[in-house]
């Protein structure tokens, strides 16, 4: 069993999901993504969503809310993921969606850039100066806007590829940043073996 298969089995993750790695806190704004998923489901667009992060008690509220919207089967709530497993969650994800109400110091966009995954990100003051045109910006409290962004990236392959290309270029510009060196070393190590995998 290869490492990726082991991670999938151990964490029970699906493939091709929407991914948001962040602590379960109100200002991380998981709710907007949950609401967007409900909008998509009502349009017969079925997506899987994976959350992961440290929890100090707020995750239970999100789980109850997801159940209320009948999204139990669509959303997987994971706890904190260690640095060794995290790259593999990016590998199976289709898109990173971050609706945090605070930024722009978050690391996940850079992880997604390295892994060549498209990014949807909150349009907050200071974000554009950091991430430029490498992400699709959304109003973080507008679930309709987030749902439209998700559909745009899944339905428009050229646009998706453009975001991936610009994101990777942005990553290359910051490749020597020490803040990301540990994660990127893990990525480099498993990439050596990835080409031998049968997924």
Residue positions per predicted region:
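Acidic donor-binding loop of glycosyltransferase active sites
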Residues: 88-104, 117-118
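Nucleotide-activated donor-binding/catalytic signature segment of Leloir-type glycosyltransferases, i.e.
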Residues: 62-84
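Conserved acidic donor-binding segment of nucleotide-sugar-dependent glycosyltransferases
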Residues: 136-143, 152-157
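Glycosyltransferase donor-sugar binding loop
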Residues: 48-63, 79
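Short acidic alpha-helix that forms the nucleotide-activated donor recognition element
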Residues: 82-93, 114, 128
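A structural motif in glycosyltransferase catalytic domains
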Residues: 18, 33-37, 49, 112, ...
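Conserved donor-binding/catalytic core segment of Leloir-type glycosyltransferases
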Residues: 12-28, 34-37
């Amino acid at each position: 069993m290869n490492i990726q298969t082991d991670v999938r089995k151990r964490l029970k993750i699906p493939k091709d999901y929407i991914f948001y790695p962040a602590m379960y806190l109100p200002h991380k704004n998981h709710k907007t993504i949950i609401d967007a998923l409900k909008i998509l489901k009502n349009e017969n667009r079925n997506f899987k969503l994976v959350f992961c992060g440290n929890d100090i008690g707020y995750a239970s509220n999100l789980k109850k809310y997801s159940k209320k919207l009948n999204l139990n089967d669509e959303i997987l709530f994971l706890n904190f993921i260690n640095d060794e497993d995290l790259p593999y969650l990016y590998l199976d994800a289709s898109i990173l969606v971050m609706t945090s109400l605070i930024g722009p110091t978050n690391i996940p966009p850079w992880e997604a850039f390295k892994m060549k995954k498209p990014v949807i990100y909150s349009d907050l003051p200071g974000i554009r100066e950091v991430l430029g045109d490498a992400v699709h910006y959304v109003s973080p409290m507008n679930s309709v806007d987030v749902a439209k962004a998700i559909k745009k990236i899944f339905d428009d392959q050229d646009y998706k590829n453009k975001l991936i290309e610009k994101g990777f270029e942005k990553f290359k510009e910051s490749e020597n940043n020490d803040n990301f060196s540990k994660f990127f070393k893990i990525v480099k190590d498993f990439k050596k073996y990835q080409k031998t995998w049968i997924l």
